[in-house]
Regions:
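Glycosyltransferase catalytic domains, chiefly GT-A lineage
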Residues: 1-194
């Protein structure tokens, strides 16, 4: 039914779109925690299940790797000039989240019809750089509660982001340091896995 809108990219398969359907598949549950398979759990994530989402439909962590790369205009972004946040409706790069860990408030997602919303956004944009993540960021950009970075510590951050102070806020730099010292989840983003 959806094959004509799902496309693969680089090392991303069509499985990346499965998270769009979580509110529909798990409609009998109040809350679902979605985690990518390339995550290492260092702490008990049960505390995430009961966190107050402050009325938001989802919770996630900011994608510091994307934020840093975008601000620096790194080689990755130069190769992918078509990835223009303004053009695809991302209002604030500072609020762009990583979709590797998402806490879904199922009732709120159903209320805003998030499944249809995500599918309609995907139909509109057929060449997104990070298709699933970009769609989720467009769909939920005003409806996300941001978790501390320790819950999605991207393992490449301290290696790739050598000039953090030039491109990231002091608050984000402090969160990166805290997350590195005491991670709840380590996320092995990128093609390189342990």
């Amino acid at each position: 039914q959806y094959d004509n809108i799902f496309y693969e990219k680089s090392y991303f398969s069509t499985a990346m779109y499965y998270r769009f359907f979580i509110p529909k598949i798990f409609c009998d549950f109040e809350r679902v925690i979605y985690c990518d398979s390339d995550m290492l759990f260092k702490k008990d994530i049960s505390e995430l299940f009961f966190i107050d989402l402050k009325g938001k439909a989802i919770a996630a962590c900011r994608d510091v790797a994307v934020l840093y790369s975008y601000r620096k205009r790194s080689e990755i972004w130069q190769r992918n000039i078509g990835h223009n946040f303004d053009k695809i409706g991302i209002l604030s790069i500072d609020n762009y989240f990583n979709s590797g860990l998402i806490i879904f408030d199922i009732n709120k997602c159903v209320k805003i019809q998030s499944v249809s919303l995500c599918l309609n956004i995907l139909k509109k944009y057929d060449n997104l750089y990070l298709p699933d993540q970009d769609v989720l960021n467009i769909a939920f950009q005003n409806n996300v509660y941001f978790l501390h970075l320790r819950w999605n510590f991207q393992w490449t951050i301290h290696i790739e982001c050598k000039q953090k102070s030039l491109y990231l806020s002091q608050q984000i730099i402090e969160e990166i340091y805290e997350a590195r010292m005491d991670p709840g989840i380590i996320h092995y983003i990128s093609e390189t896995k342990p």
